[in-house]
Amino acid sequence: MAELPMSTHLFARLLSRVHAVCAALIEEGALPAGIDLSRVVVEPPKDASHGDMATNAAMVLAKDAKAKPRDLADKIADKLRAEELIDQVAIAGPGFINLTLKPAVWAEALRAVLDAGAGYGRSTVGGGEKVNVEYVSANPTGPMHVGHCRGAVFGDALANLLDTAGYDVTREYYINDAGAQVDVLARSAFLRYREALGETIGEIPEGLYPGDYLKPVGEALKAEHGAALKDMPEAQWLPTVRATAIAMMMEAIKGDLAALNITHEVFFSERSLIEGGRNRVAETIEFLRAKGDVYQGRLPPPKGAPVEDYEDREQTLFRATAYGDDVDRPLLKSDGSYTYFASDIAYHKVKFDAGFANMVDVWGADHGGYIKRMQAAIQAVTAGKGALDVKIVQLVRLLRNGEPVKMSKRAGDFVTLREVVDEVGSDAVRFMMLFRKNDAVLDFDLAKVIEQSKDNPVFYVQYGHARGHSIFRNAREVVPDLPEDSKARAAMLRQAPLERLNDPAELELLKRLALYPRIVEAAAQAHEPHRIAFYLNELASEFHALWTHGRDLPHLRFIINNDAEITRARLAMVQGVVSVLASGLAILGVTAPDEMR
């Protein structure tokens, strides 16, 4: 059998064959010309006993073909039986087509893993499209807390995933440095400045930030300005103190993110929208006004419970209802300043004008009600050419042995990100923050994430990678020329008699490896990096189970002392496993250790 092209994974290749069969049926008149094949998929069947792959082609094409799904399935199945890769074709239920592939396919799929090495799973599905992923964007008013941590990890892993799938990714952080909260920060820092000068400031007043983390800001202000700011009116000292406090908070935030191996290419200041000789917020409002999307009007009172920001007055409104929102939205406050929404529209227009028609924002759970208006605004400012996907990241409940963790005294009222990373490590934080879908509340137990057991997914997956390398070290008694270098080892092992990997458990593991590129593409298109974490856990579980079988059934051991050829074949399978585990862990931003102590 000819080798599979490395650039095309099995599922994509089978889909192309199904499309070719449909094209032949169009030629024969069994399908109408121009029929839409975009809904046709090839995927693993829900029940593995039904085969290796399944297609819905007959189900989704039957209506346009004016045929019964089962009858159309018969025609498609007849042609698929002639395909080189396919061993058996069966029609199930109303017209699903189940495919069983020839055993030799899985040996060639393993060779594709070995040939691609670290590049296995990389895809061109993104086509180089530019995508902007904005994540974290925590207010620069204090250290990052554990709630920020989940959004940071999710956004970073999503950016890695999109890059792996062939998108041109920019990682961006939006600095909220123009709102009232940074003035509160400045007043809080000014108290710490007075404290640094020797004053007794007493208890921090209600409404200011109480944490000790602002003491270094006070010391820095003293070092730079001495007592010069102390007796100035607030209007004079506030801009200076605010700028210093924001700069120091952002450096602290960058340090917190670095502890999780997170970096951004772009830090965009909200204040830059209205400073520097150009007011982009005003420009955006006028741009929308010229389109008829901004008008002067009054909003009706909200139904049900009162809304805090409702004002019964004539105001400048964005016609959000024309783009699917429930109500039109104010752009100016009663004091003439811009609403946060107005700044947000301008910010996203800047991104679109920079070439990002594809934008992803990662927001906290408390911003869910903001999505509709923002997506309406994107449609308006991009004339329907831009797309915004908002990923909501739910809350994290921090536990220790099932009990809630007490708050941090230094931070004031929350547990800091740095405290969590220092205790359990970046790998445990990143993996476990991704081991649940982003829109579900996550329980993060500080004791359980460092357990060395199969009940701890991060340990289980990393141990799979380490176990693979342990097998390589032990195999040198049987295969003394086994290279240390991963590429050289893969090049040697691809020559092994891989067709001897015919035990059902071995074949299942090879099938799991062949699934990985499809998982990457599907996860990238859905913006769901948790799918990678789930897949890695399943792969590691199958690998560990096969190793355990070898303890009980000597003929299934990875290393057979008197059979170098089957040993080489099984080492090739192990090489495939460690390559895919390393690739997936890299997407998640988690290390792949060669040994664990």
Curated annotation (Swiss-Prot):
Signal peptide: none annotated. SMART domains: Arg_tRNA_synt_N (SM01016), DALR_1 (SM00836). A motif ('HIGH' region) lies at residues 138-148. Belongs to the class-I aminoacyl-tRNA synthetase family. It catalyses: tRNA(Arg) + L-arginine + ATP = L-arginyl-tRNA(Arg) + AMP + diphosphate. This is Arginine--tRNA ligase. It is found in: Cytoplasm.
